[in-house]
């Protein structure tokens, strides 16, 4: 009898642990605190950002990068360098770390950067640069991912992000332009390209696992707003928007990729009257890079 009871409690505990791991994090009443000011290069706006363990990589327009040590109460600047993809056509709007390493001994996984600019790169748009970065060595461009958008499915601001849970590469962005008449926001999901796929990878719309416009599924998501970065946590896509102004407030939309609906619309304009940029999770919190307000920590409410 004791053995059966022990097994029962172990099984119950395991089920509860699995359910807790699958439960979305609630940022509805999140506490908001500034971590620190950013120390990038002058005269270039802050854009993409990615976190690996306790390293935060902050990007600026054209592809300037700064690596910080992230702690509960601050940022320690470790290294500043231009990406291998540094160029006027690289807005470097979104960044994320992948799951592969260029070499097994590399300190960081591969680093992905969304070009996301009205200016085309070698005549191309919708480009994702894949780089090998380091604290000590020069960065190296090891792969370029391109969506062959012959149908005009996206405007100029296609942002790439990774769904770690399912190993998907997700493209998200406007169909015309942020404030354009008739604009919508499209999401396309692809299997994650591998480094072994080659130096240049062309994605075709026909190969997408899913392809839809958010407004077709949930009209609460506005067609016109100032889009910023994005990231995926479990089955949710976190979409920061706005300029931190009354006309374009700092809002965080949380899109459920599984249910295909908005889970939350969170207005943080009062707490963060600055332009949201890119975001990434860190130890259960959400870290947001801003223009003018430094790095911000959103700590979920405890129930």
Where are these regions (language model features)?
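Surface loop/turn motifs at the tips and blade-to-blade linkers of beta-strand repeat domains
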Residues: 37-42, 82-87, 146-153, 217-223, ...
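Structural signature of eukaryotic scaffold interfaces centered on beta-propeller domains
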Residues: 45-52, 91-108, 154-169, 223-233, ...
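Structural motif
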Residues: 63-69, 119-132, 177-191, 246-254, ...
């Amino acid at each position: 009898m004791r053995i059966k009871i022990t097994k029962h409690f172990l099984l119950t505990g395991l089920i509860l642990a699995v359910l807790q791991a699958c439960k979305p994090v609630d940022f509805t009443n999140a506490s908001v605190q500034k971590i620190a000011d950013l120390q990038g290069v002058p005269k270039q706006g802050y854009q993409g950002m990615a976190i690996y363990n306790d390293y935060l990589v902050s990007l600026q327009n054209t592809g300037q990068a700064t690596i910080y040590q992230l702690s509960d109460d601050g940022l320690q600047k470790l290294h500043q360098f231009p990406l291998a993809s540094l160029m006027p056509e690289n807005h470097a709007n979104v960044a994320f770390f992948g799951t592969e390493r260029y070499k097994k001994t590399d300190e960081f996984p591969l680093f992905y950067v969304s070009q996301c600019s009205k200016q085309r790169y070698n005549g191309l748009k919708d480009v994702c640069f894949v780089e090998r970065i380091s604290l000590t060595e020069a960065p190296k461009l090891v792969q370029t991912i391109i969506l062959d958008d012959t149908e005009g499915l996206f405007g100029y601001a296609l942002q790439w992000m990774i769904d770690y849970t399912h190993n998907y590469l997700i493209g998200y962005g406007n169909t015309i332009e942020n404030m354009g008449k008739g604009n919508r926001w499209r999401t396309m999901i692809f299997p994650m390209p591998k480094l072994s796929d080659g130096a240049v990878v062309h994605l075709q719309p026909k190969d997408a696992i899913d392809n839809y416009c958010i407004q077709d599924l949930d009209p609460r998501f506005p067609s016109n707003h100032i889009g910023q970065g994005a990231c995926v946590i479990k089955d949710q896509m976190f979409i920061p928007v706005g300029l931190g102004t009354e006309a374009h407030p700092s809002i965080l939309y949380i899109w459920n990729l599984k249910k295909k609906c908005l889970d939350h619309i969170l207005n943080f304009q009062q707490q963060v009257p600055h332009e949201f940029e890119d975001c990434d999770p860190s130890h259960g919190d959400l870290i947001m890079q801003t223009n003018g307000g430094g790095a911000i920590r959103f700590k979920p409410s405890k129930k």
